[in-house]
């Protein structure tokens, strides 16, 4: 996810890595939460032999319990009136229809109907209750199988029943929720720092950011409008992305970072842009050694293909250092 969102190039994105209960304390924070929950994987049976071998009725029960735990953990962080997308890649009612009914009776959620077209061949409730839920079966739609329901947080006390029935909280959640919260270490933020003119010139809208420099000398630009939510997230979970990583200090030099090259906030005039061929672009993305055209400027340049920024290279003349992230390189051409 961190790689994909960095490639997207939008500065207003943060990526964390934590258990769901890390977010319980962020009450009424998010407008939308998407929960692509772990499941028994019946939608993977056609293409994954291991998924078939690992399936059992006990696995379905265990997955449903985990799904309830996840929704219970993140529900307080959803704003009143906010939406929660619940999805699985399985077919059974225990993890799908029964689970969202549980969310309504226990969490005070309500199911929201999503407009669809009959031409899409999406199937509805399989339990005869006419619930506004959506099955994407592999014999009717493209893909291996998907279930989706849209939940809305009612503006009333959690636990009030909308569909009738008793409230439920799994014993597993009761045992682990408190212990994880107690053991969780608060993570502070890197203090804001004053960037020099060079750093400021690398963003076309630098006045919309604050700048932070880590102990390792990595400079990050954080959109001013999102500093508050970034600080909240950093207090409960490690941040894999917390803004645009724009430069790393190496001695007295500033080495531009890959995220800057592909950010929509990067200044087009900060670094020369060199358009390259398809063959050279593939070699670059494969992180091979490359040589740029003789007329290419020396130093750090942004390589582009069909006008789209691919990343940085340091052009030395007789060769160019390929600065594409090693962990992102194309494995197969």
Q: Where do the PLM segments sit?
A:
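Residue-level signal for inorganic ion chemistry
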Residues: 1, 33, 82, 103, ...
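S-adenosyl-L-methionine
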Residues: 1-28, 35
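Mobile active-site "lid"/loop adjacent to the S-adenosyl-L-methionine
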Residues: 31-72, 89-96, 118-121
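Conserved beta-strand signature within the Rossmann-like core of class I S-adenosyl-L-methionine
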Residues: 83-88
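Conserved Class I S-adenosyl-L-methionine
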Residues: 97-119
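Polybasic, low-complexity RNA-engagement segments
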Residues: 144, 154-333
